[in-house]
Regions:
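Active-site-proximal alpha-helix that buttresses catalytic centers in soluble enzyme cores
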Residues: 7-70, 110-119
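Active-site neighborhood of phospho(di)ester-bond hydrolases with catalytic His/Asp-centered motifs
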Residues: 6-7, 75
Length: 124
């Protein structure tokens, strides 16, 4: 079995240099184009299944890239890290906090260890 890991296309928060986390934001114009290009990249590869988070940026990337060509599992456990009170804050603020958040959750959010556990739960 081959597994491809692909991130969502560029979101409006990515362009604004915000740490989206669990903030549900749309793709930017660039992201819409990237999603179309992603579909082209995979056009000659047969996929059995696509899995993505339930956030708009992930779902829209899949919809634009692949349409209804493949079955899709949308699952909250595949979300990015929950920065809690820092969802949507400037990326530079969040970047400076990451090392201390490996085991210790972001306020009203989660730690990196918790995120890994959540994704591990999905995979098993």
């Amino acid at each position: 079995m081959k597994v491809f890991f692909v991130t969502h296309a560029t979101s409006k928060d990515n362009e604004d240099k915000s740490a989206s986390g669990w903030k549900d934001v749309e793709l930017s114009e660039l992201g819409l184009q990237q999603a179309r290009e992603r579909g082209e990249t995979f056009k000659d590869i047969k996929l059995d299944l696509i899995c993505c988070s339930d956030l708009k940026r992930a779902v829209h990337t899949v919809q634009i890239a692949f349409g209804q060509k493949y079955p899709v599992i949308v699952d909250k456990r595949l979300r990015e890290l929950n920065y809690g009170d820092f969802n949507g804050k400037p990326r530079e603020v969040v970047e400076g906090m990451k090392k201390e958040r490996i085991s210790e959750p972001f306020p009203n959010g989660e730690s990196y260890e918790q995120a890994v556990g959540r994704i591990h739960d999905f995979c098993h």
